[in-house]
């Protein structure tokens, strides 16, 4: 498995969203309790029981991994692996924040790491003014 992209070799019981051979994105967040305040408010990454690929869950650069289908998604064929890889970590983290301001004319980015770099490109493409604070 390279850069959080996998080819589904086998599916667990009840998994119907993917077919064997599907090219699947496996993001860093790989599981959470689903019951706490954070999980109930779409902030699973802050859950005390959150599990992460490459930390508690083998993956990232492993040859094989087991991933919870809840957190995975099929990758469109138009994206090559190198194009999709940044979107599976920094892109997902940044997009969660961007959804809160996506209709704003101007947005501020505090810090300028990988997530902000990706979001600046999205915002610029959408004609938004960007203010970065580093």
Predicted regions and their residues:
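Cysteine-cluster motifs in flexible loop/terminal segments that predominantly coordinate metals
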Residues: 29-73, 77
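Glycine-rich beta-strand-centered segment in the early N-terminal region that forms part
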Residues: 1-37, 76-79
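Short, well-structured alpha-helical patches and their helix-loop capping segments
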Residues: 28, 53-57, 67, 85-89, ...
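Short, glycine/charged-enriched secondary-structure capping and boundary segments
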Residues: 21-22, 39-41, 122-125
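ATP/adenylate-binding site constellation spanning eukaryotic-like Ser/Thr protein kinases
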Residues: 5, 41, 69, 90, ...
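Mid-domain Rossmann-like dinucleotide-binding core that forms the NAD(H)/NADP(H) cofactor-binding site
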Residues: 77-134
């Amino acid at each position: 498995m390279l850069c959080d992209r996998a080819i589904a070799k086998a599916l667990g019981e009840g998994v119907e969203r993917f077919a064997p051979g599907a090219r699947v994105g496996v993001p860093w967040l790989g599981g959470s309790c689903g019951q706490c305040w954070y999980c109930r408010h779409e902030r699973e990454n802050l859950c005390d029981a959150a599990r992460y690929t490459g930390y508690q869950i083998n993956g990232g650069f492993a040859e094989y991994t087991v991933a919870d289908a809840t957190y995975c998604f099929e990758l469109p064929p138009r994206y090559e692996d190198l194009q999709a890889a940044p979107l599976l970590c920094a892109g997902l983290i940044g997009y969660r924040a961007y959804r809160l301001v996506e209709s704003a004319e101007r947005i501020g980015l505090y810090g300028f790491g990988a997530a902000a770099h990706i979001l600046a490109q999205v915002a610029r493409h959408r004609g938004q003014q960007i203010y970065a604070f580093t």
